[in-house]
Amino acid sequence: MSHRFLKRKREHLKTIKPDIYLLGEIWHDASQWLQGDEYDSVMNYPLLSGIHDFFLDKTMKKEEFEYMVNRCYTMYMQQNNDVLFNLLDSHDTERLMNRFHDLDKFYQQLAILFTLPGSPCIYYGTEIAMEGAHDPDCRRCMPWSEIESEENQKKIATMRKLIMLRRNEKVCRSLHFHFPNGYENDRCVEYIKLDEEGNKIEVLLNASDEEIKVKGDGEVLFAREFDGEILGVNGTLIRRM
């Protein structure tokens, strides 16, 4: 669709329903569509690609992850970052679980999704770590007959924990974050989220092949492969500081 058409479409739709949310599916830098007169937001495919690349490519260092995230959040105006449609898989991509076949890596990436600015989106089936290769396999039917299985209920419960963390902790939704680089390990990602009231959480992801001794203390809000001191390989830790 042309920019001219989108501008006229927005003007017409906003006249009918002023609070309508116009979302675009743009796979690259969408700045020219987000000038306030076309889309309100876009699907954040650059963030999806950057997260996947870091976890797929073991040669990438945490500084490259940091650069990617910062780039994604400096491409657009701040009001756009508030409502970016953040996703890890969709009807047009290979499913998240299909890329890694590893629940720990799967939840590491979901922890990122639920602690960065924007609007987290879960593709149907991701709540049970459903697999599926590239289109059309990524659009396979939801296995409703298997939903009540013990394994799937555990996965759904874990997803609910992340959703409730996002909902209950304002700092998870905050726009403010930084990377302190407090660990020497090249693939130990650490970032701090802050809100306007001074609340802080730390997100720690061990994407290396070595265990990491965690520094300091804090209230654990979400964890995998963490025993209270050591964050295991592919471990995740979100804690209040």
Regions found by a protein language model. Name each.
Residues 227-241:
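C-terminal beta-strand-rich structural cap/linker in extracellular carbohydrate-active enzymes
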Residues 12, 19-21, 83-85, 119-122, ...:
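Beta-sheet entry/capping signal
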Residues 217-226:
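Solvent-exposed beta-hairpin/edge-strand motifs
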Residues 35-41, 82, 89-103, 110-151:
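Aromatic/acidic polysaccharide-binding cleft in carbohydrate-active enzymes
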Residues 159-173:
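Amphipathic alpha-helical
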Residues 23-24, 120-124, 170-176:
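Acidic/polar loop patches that form or flank catalytic/metal-binding clefts of enzymes
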Residues 1-79, 131-161, 196, 209-210:
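Active-site-proximal helices and loops of the catalytic beta/alpha 8
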Residues 180-216:
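Carbohydrate-binding surface patches
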